[in-house]
Regions:
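Amide-forming acyltransferase catalytic core, primarily the GNAT-like/NAT-type
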Residues: 1-49, 189-190
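Short, conserved active-site entrance elements at the starts or edges of catalytic domains
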Residues: 168-221
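A broadly conserved amphipathic alpha-helix scaffold signal in soluble, globular proteins
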Residues: 85, 105-112, 153-156, 178
Length: 225
């Protein structure tokens, strides 16, 4: 029924088409992120009917990012429920529970209509994305942004500069990332995975449609994104 496998660069167009249909706004709904960070949780993928399904693992238990590729209108919801029932059987055959992540508040409501009290919902604040009003970040008014105003003041007091990344900068960025990793906690698995993610981002930079920038202090790189 399902044939999960590691994500590949050749999956870009098909995955992006599914992501465009659903248009979810979490960082996990990015082909570039899915590809580059796949080693963080042993993520595997499958295409089932019109759905793009991403399955990761935590302490050996599978969890599925809320699938994309089908709209959540009335007919689409029926397809989702049908898929979830099949995934429930798939995980049950593994002796594991069925779990979804990145479920929107809207999806929770219609899932409750079907599953009732059998549906358990938990908020994972540590996984929330940060969302700011652009006008707030432009003005930085009030006590809430006092710290950010101080950061900007410190920035202006030093010989700081910013530049957009080009392929000519990738070697310097890679060396900076390696130095940062060497000074980090080697027991932090995510730090090691980050090195692989950076490698993938730079290897397929243009193909993934990425943009980046670097900060310099006194002519020396201080960070990049």
């Amino acid at each position: 029924m399902f044939d999960f496998r590691p994500i590949e660069i050749a999956d870009r167009d098909r995955i992006n088409a599914c992501l465009a249909v659903s248009d979810y706004r979490g960082c996990e709904y990015s082909f570039a992120n899915n590809l580059a960070w796949r080693r963080l949780a042993d993520t595997v993928i499958d295409f089932y009917n019109d759905f793009y399904i991403s399955c990761s693992f935590y302490d050996g238990d599978p969890y599925f990012t809320f699938p994309t590729g089908v709209k959540t209108d009335e007919s689409g919801r029926e397809k989702y429920i049908e898929l979830f029932e099949k995934l429930k059987k798939y995980t049950a055959d593994m002796g594991k529970p069925f779990a979804l992540t990145s479920v929107s508040a809207e999806a929770v409501e219609w899932l409750k209509e079907y599953y009732g009290d059998s549906l358990k919902v938990e908020a994972e604040r540590g996984s929330f994305d940060y969302i700011y009003e652009s006008s707030d970040l432009i003005a930085l008014s009030g006590k809430k942004y006092h710290g950010k105003r101080n950061h900007i003041k410190h920035f202006k007091e030093n010989d700081w500069s910013f530049k957009l990344l080009t392929p000519d900068d990738f070697d310097e960025c890679t060396a900076f990332a390696a130095d940062s990793y060497d000074s980090s906690d080697k027991n932090d698995f995510s730090a090691a995975v980050e090195q692989y993610a950076i490698y993938i981002f730079f290897k397929y930079y243009d193909y993934l449609g990425l943009k980046g920038g670097a900060l310099y202090c006194n002519g020396k790189m201080a960070g990049f994104t």
